Design a protein with these regions (language model features):
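C-terminal alpha-helical cap/extension of soluble enzyme domains
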Residues: 209-279
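Thr-Gly-centered strand-to-loop micro-motif
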Residues: 202-204
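A short N-terminal beta->alpha junction/helix N-cap motif
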Residues: 17-25, 49-53, 253, 257
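Alpha/beta enzyme core
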Residues: 3-14, 25-52, 59-75, 83-198, ...
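Bateman/CBS regulatory modules and CBS-like beta-alpha motifs in cytosolic regions of diverse proteins
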Residues: 2-3, 269
Length: 279
């Protein structure tokens, strides 16, 4: 069933687990993610990058995600990931998104607050929750990767914007790590306390050691993003299949194993964050 961001976040908060948020790129990744959620009876988030939303892909992929969510036997939120502007968030709302991320993390603090507050106000009329970001979660190519989020800034940001959840910088990055990251668990605990237990979001979940993920969930992470490993699961399996002399030629048959690879990866993350059986 299609639900809004607030619904899955409340489920996670009440149950003390984390909602896995999987980035999808085509119909095959949507199918893999959906099958994983239904098989494990887990509430999930399917999210799309803004670059896909503003291309032809978004125009055609959004109805696929909405149809998958509508027929799903588990709660599914359709979420915009890293929306950089009001234009992008408005486009995603028109496409049917039930959750919006407004990423103003590279802006000056005051501008980030003001932009996020405006988007929260707009989305409130449609009962759509908003994820903000404070402290910059960079890429694995960045020298320092993060500008860590401080409890003082987080408290003010949450109070003045009214976000449903807050993405924080605590030691992760986007992309594939050259060495396993170590999360600042004490900072996560401090951020939760400062924000009156606001749902916190961890970006860059791909490649984080399992034990670090468990600690982060226990400390209060309620949404965790997985994108890079979705891509590797799909593409690596495609490459393996292409090397086989007797590979399927019909595209639908060829895609069965990549879909299965995405499903198996998602199942592993669903169980790791404790979302299995929570739908």
């Amino acid at each position: 069933m299609l639900v809004n961001l607030q619904t899955v976040l409340k489920m996670a908060e009440d149950g003390g687990f984390c909602i896995p948020a999987f980035n999808v790129y085509n119909m095959e990744t949507v199918i893999g993610v959906l099958h994983a959620a239904e098989e494990t009876k887990a509430p999930i988030i399917m999210q799309i990058y803004p670059r896909l939303m503003k291309e032809e892909t978004g125009y055609f992929l959004s109805p696929v995600v909405l149809a998958a969510a509508a027929r799903a036997s588990v709660p599914v939120c359709f979420h915009l990931d890293h929306g950089p502007s009001e234009l992008e968030t408005t486009r995603s709302l028109r496409y049917g998104a039930t959750g919006i991320m407004l990423d103003g993390s590279t802006l000056p603090f005051e501008e980030n607050i003001e932009l996020t507050r405006r988007v929260v106000e707009t989305c409130s009329y449609l009962n759509v929750g908003v994820e903000g970001e404070l402290g910059h979660v960079g890429t694995t190519a960045d020298a320092d990767m993060d500008e860590f989020t401080t409890p003082e800034d987080a408290k003010r940001f949450v109070e003045e914007t009214g976000v449903s959840c807050l993405a924080v910088a605590v030691g992760t990055a986007h992309g594939r790590y050259s060495k396993p990251p170590k999360l600042d668990i004490d900072r996560i605990c401090a951020l939760r306390k400062a924000t009156n237990n606001t749902a916190l979001v961890l970006h860059g979940g791909s490649g984080v050691p399992d034990e670090e993920i468990r600690k982060a969930v226990a400390a209060g992470i309620r949404k965790m993003n997985f994108a890079t490993d979705i891509c590797y699961a799909f593409l690596d399996t495609c490459l393996e299949e292409l090397q086989k002399p007797n590979r399927a030629v019909a595209v639908d048959n060829f895609m069965k194993k990549p879909i299965e690879a995405v499903k198996e990866f998602c199942i592993s993350r669903i169980k790791l964050v404790g979302a299995d059986g929570k739908a």
